[in-house]
Structures are given as C-alpha cells and as structure tokens.
Regions:
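Periplasmic peptidoglycan-binding/tethering modules of Gram-negative envelope proteins
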Residues: 1-42, 82, 96, 100-113
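Periplasmic OmpA-like peptidoglycan-binding domain that tethers envelope proteins to the cell wall
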Residues: 25, 48-113
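Conserved phosphate/oxyanion-binding catalytic-loop motifs
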Residues: 45
C-alpha cells in the first residue's frame, strides 16, 4: 500500500490560550507517525490567531507561542528540529471563514520523494 505523499492536521486552541487538548495531541501523534514513515519529509507548522479578539501585537505573540508549543510536542515525539519549518501569521491571515476556527496551528507534512 502506498503511503500518502502529504498530510494536514489542525490543532485548535481555546481563545487566548496555547494549551493543546486531547484531540490536538492525537493529531500530533499522527503527524509524528507520518514523519517516522517518511524520513525525507518535512513538516510546516504555522500558528494563527483569530481576528475577533486581541490586538495585532497580542495575536502575533499568541500565534507564535502556539507554533512553538506544537513544534516542541513534535520534537518530543521524535521529529528532528531540522525537519520542522515553523512560522506564525498572527491574525493577519485567516485560514478559515469561521473566526473561532482561526485559533489554530496547522501542520502540513510532505514527503520529498
């Protein structure tokens, strides 16, 4: 059976928080498992914050912290730091039309082969 060439997982957060819930940990386990199966893969971790709350400065800080936390959890699960590309968009970019869903860190892992 051919493995997927990429996976995408969203880790959602409560407003103003950077604590990962049980569902988020499950998604990070899936990303880590994919990374172990695909040793040439890299994972892009991008943190976001919703536009509906906080100032741009606060949202930048929250989104960056969310990306940091997700990166740390992937490293704990055996993903090498040099295989993780991390960024944050604050509230400048909104990946979802539903404001509440933009309290998220999106992980996209792609195999290079």
């Amino acid at each position: 059976m051919k493995k997927a060439s990429s996976i995408r997982r969203e880790v959602f957060f409560t407003i103003g928080k950077n604590v990962i819930n049980a569902e988020g940990f499950k998604k990070l386990d899936e990303v880590a498992a994919y990374m172990k199966e695909c040793p040439e893969a890299t994972v892009t971790v991008t943190g976001y914050a919703d536009r509906g709350t906080g100032s741009a400065k606060i949202n930048d800080r929250i989104a960056a912290r969310r990306a940091d936390i997700v990166e740390a959890e992937l490293i704990k699960r055996g993903v090498a730091r040099d295989r993780i590309i991390k960024s944050s968009k604050g509230s400048r970019v909104q990946p979802f039309s539903d404001n509440d869903m933009n309290r998220v860190t999106i992980c996209i892992a792609e195999d290079k082969i």
